[in-house]
Swiss-Prot record:
The keyword Acetylation applies. Its EC number is 3.5.99.6. It comes from Homo sapiens (Human). Keywords: Acetylation, Carbohydrate metabolism, Cytoplasm, Hydrolase, Isomerase, Phosphoprotein. This is Glucosamine-6-phosphate deaminase 1.
Length: 289
């Protein structure tokens, strides 16, 4: 398990975006080998998405051979509703990059048979070869996706009734009116995310400091579902200073002492543009023994 501590939200977002960029470039995806990426919604990943869009526009990264699977979606909201997660992803990320629409997978909260939709989503993940990197965020109560306190730590994609704390937290997106907030959602399970070959969890802000403490310094507990990722062989927690306020000083000092090593994970790699330039130049070289 790695804990990456950056001073500010913007730095944490950039580190996370660089990590995703490097993983995609290292994977070297193509028509016969797609990179599969799990993605969250919410305010936390917005900075990361903006940096990824920047890398694409600069010619440093392509999403042409990337398949995405989103964590969750509300039940009952039309796809084009401004607060649906489908709208969120397209407005904040997908429409700004070169990903093919058929390669984006978001649960349908208006499906006739909701559990069948969840089962089909699991099958699509399997058919894609599993998730290479699942990126997630958490709530102040440590929930990941809509796996709220008390959720099974081996759960799969399913229909979930939302806790009142979540409904209250989400009311700000629905004009502050609780009656407008969906009370159910479709969500990947903790087990679904745990199956990914790698997991990166973004945690920023003082209001999530206690959740980070539960995830890092205490044991695995289904009342804090994020704690399950202590047991994943390749988990990276990325946070800002504010999120570390509940951690012990020696814990923060220990992980900060590893940053010289961890920062090598986001060292610049060849961009798409640089690869094409190198290939073009090598093709012009005269033949020699």
């Amino acid at each position: 398990m790695k804990l990456i501590i950056l001073e500010h939200y913007s730095q944490a977002s950039e580190w996370a975006a660089k990590y995703i960029r490097n993983r995609i470039i290292q994977f070297n995806p193509g028509p016969e080998k797609y990179f599969t990426l799990g993605l969250p919604t919410g305010s936390t990943p917005l900075g990361c998405y903006k940096k990824l869009i920047e890398y694409y526009k600069n010619g440093d990264l392509s999403f042409k051979y990337v398949k995405t699977f989103n964590m969750d979606e509300y039940v009952g909201l039309p796809r084009d509703h401004p607060e649906s997660y489908h709208s969120f992803m397209w407005n904040n990320f997908f429409k700004h990059i070169d990903i093919h629409p058929e390669n984006t997978h978001i649960l349908d909260g208006n499906a006739v048979d909701l559990q069948a939709e969840c089962d089909a989503f699991e099958e699509k993940i399997k058919a894609a070869g599993g998730i290479e990197l699942f990126v997630g965020g958490i709530g102040p109560d440590g929930h990941i996706a809509f796996n709220e306190p008390g959720s099974s730590l081996v759960s799969r994609t399913r229909v979930k009734t939302l806790a009142m704390d979540t409904i209250l937290a989400n009311a700000r997106f629905f004009d502050g009116e609780l009656t407008k907030v969906p009370t159910m959602a479709l969500t990947v399970g903790v087990g679904t995310v745990m199956d990914a070959r790698e997991v990166m969890i973004l945690i920023t802000g003082a209001h999530k400091a206690f959740a980070l403490y539960k995830a890092i310094e205490e044991g695995v507990n289904h009342m804090w579902t994020v704690s399950a990722f202590q047991q994943h062989p390749r988990t990276v927690f990325v946070c800002d200073e504010d999120a570390t306020l509940e951690l012990k000083v020696k814990t923060v000092k220990y992980f900060k002492g590893l940053m010289l090593v961890h920062n090598k994970l986001v060292d610049p790699l060849y961009s798409i543009k640089e690869k094409e330039t190198e290939k073009s130049q090598s093709s012009k070289k005269p033949y020699s023994d």
